[in-house]
Swiss-Prot record:
4-CDP-2-C-methyl-D-erythritol 2-phosphate binds at residues 12-14, 38-39, 60-62, 136-139, 143, 146. This is 2-C-methyl-D-erythritol 2,4-cyclodiphosphate synthase. Involved in the biosynthesis of isopentenyl diphosphate (IPP) and dimethylallyl diphosphate (DMAPP), two major building blocks of isoprenoid compounds. Catalyzes the conversion of 4-diphosphocytidyl-2-C-methyl-D-erythritol 2-phosphate (CDP-ME2P) to 2-C-methyl-D-erythritol 2,4-cyclodiphosphate (ME-CPP) with a corresponding release of cytidine 5-monophosphate (CMP). Pfam families: YgbB. It comes from Xanthomonas euvesicatoria pv. vesicatoria (strain 85-10) (Xanthomonas campestris pv. vesicatoria). The record marks 38, 137 as: Transition state stabilizer. Its cofactor is a divalent metal cation. The gene is ispF. It comes from the Bacteria.
Length: 166
């Protein structure tokens, strides 16, 4: 049986470290810390990539962009998202919508949410209203609550655009 829709979910987390900004959804956000990561550490785009890959059972971001590979040192996570989108399109799928939640006490995400939505929609060539970015705190519980790091969750709905050749 073949369906014309698939769903996927992703999660990413990074600890805070030295720096003066974090990348969130492809947007540079000023912050008192950076993140400890091999690439630019964009938890939003990393979670979104994992959701997209998971929807088609294509593995995870670590398999496609291993931290052991020097090519990805300090890489712009927009590259990762475009690669994942290309894999979907090659197989006849597109992102129908994406729903992303950032979990942190700081930085405040709200003032940057529209810019993140615009960046993600542009990278995926989808409508702005197909991308949701929102934030929550963990009520000062756990590592995000103590301000030690940042996390993101993403859910996607994929739609079939073409039946791949057999």
């Amino acid at each position: 049986m073949s369906f014309n829709f698939r769903i996927g979910q992703g999660y990413d987390v990074h600890a805070f470290g030295p720096g003066d900004h974090v990348m969130l959804g492809g947007v540079r956000v000023a912050h008192s810390h950076g993140v400890l990561a091999h690439s630019d550490g964009d938890v939003v785009l990393h979670a979104l990539c994992d959701a997209m890959l998971g929807a088609l059972a294509l593995g995870d971001i670590g398999q496609h962009f291993p931290p052991s590979d020097a090519r990805w040192k300090d890489a712009d996570s927009a590259q990762f998202l475009q690669h994942c989108d290309g894999l979907l399109r090659e197989r006849g799928w597109r992102v129908g919508n994406a729903d992303i939640t950032v979990i942190c006490e700081r930085p405040k995400v709200g003032p940057h949410a529209v810019a993140m939505r615009e960046r993600i929609a542009g990278l995926l060539a989808i409508e702005l209203d197909a991308v949701s970015v929102k934030a929550t705190t963990s009520e000062q519980l756990g590592f995000t609550g103590r301000g030690e790091g940042i996390a993101a969750q993403a859910a996607v709905l994929l739609g079939r655009t073409a039946v791949p050749h057999q």
